[in-house]
């Protein structure tokens, strides 16, 4: 049985897809892992020598890594709205953060996936710029939403979204620099980080960057948790992960 691996790191990483019968190949499971406020700088597979992200790096190394991918919505909810609709933010007036305009519900990806027989879940990021009921488009949406829900029928393919806040920039202001734990516990040394040229090289900024990279390492463990679950259930060879 041949397994093909692709991985694309935009704000997340990876795609695992492979064997099984021909019908299963036509309807793979889809696992969409979303993270917040990240860039290629935050991951080892894009050249950061100071952060440990072995799971994401292995996904990139085993498949296709995108080096010229760009967001068509340069902020939180506009970017998310573009991905879930497959459209430019300006197409439906979604380019302003949390500026609500009427949007045709049928443009949303979960509507198409459910019509194709997929069980669709979201845990639980639905911050889209739309007046539509962002939860109604899912079979299950909320803190307990999962592809492991007993409501999913046997052998029914799933489209499942999970979101982690571990790298959200709001986390930076949640802890004063003198309240953060020793970064050495995570293998990080703020003094040795390579800062972007446009930021001030001061201890506070170095602490912020190290704190953010600590979140990236937490994300790597989080991604690994899902991959382990897919392998345990023997779903890994017919699941797209991105």
Where are the predicted features?
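Formylglycine-dependent sulfatase
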Residues: 2, 6, 14, 20-242
């Amino acid at each position: 049985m041949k397994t093909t691996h692709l991985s694309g790191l935009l704000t997340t990483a990876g795609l695992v897809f492979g064997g099984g019968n021909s019908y299963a190949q036509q309807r793979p499971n889809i696992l969409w892992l979303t993270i917040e406020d990240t860039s290629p700088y935050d991951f080892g597979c894009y050249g950061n020598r100071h952060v440990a992200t072995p799971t994401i790096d292995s996904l990139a190394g085993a498949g296709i890594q995108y080096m010229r991918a760009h967001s068509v919505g340069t902020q939180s909810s506009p970017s998310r709205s573009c991905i879930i609709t497959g459209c430019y933010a300006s197409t439906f007036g979604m380019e302003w953060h949390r500026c609500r305009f009427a949007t045709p519900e049928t443009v949303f990806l979960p509507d198409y996936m459910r019509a194709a027989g997929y069980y669709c879940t979201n845990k639980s990021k639905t911050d889209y710029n739309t007046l539509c009921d962002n939860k109604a488009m899912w079979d299950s949406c909320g803190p307990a939403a999962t592809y492991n829900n007993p409501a999913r029928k046997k052998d029914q393919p799933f489209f499942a979204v999970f979101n982690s806040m571990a790298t959200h920039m709001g986390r930076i202001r949640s802890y004063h620099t003198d309240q953060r734990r020793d970064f050495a516990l995570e293998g990080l040394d703020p003094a040795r980080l390579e800062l972007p040229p446009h930021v001030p090289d001061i201890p506070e900024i170095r602490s912020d960057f190290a704190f953010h990279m600590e979140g990236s390492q937490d994300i790597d463990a989080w991604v690994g948790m899902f991959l382990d679950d897919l392998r345990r259930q023997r779903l890994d060879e017919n699941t797209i992960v991105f």
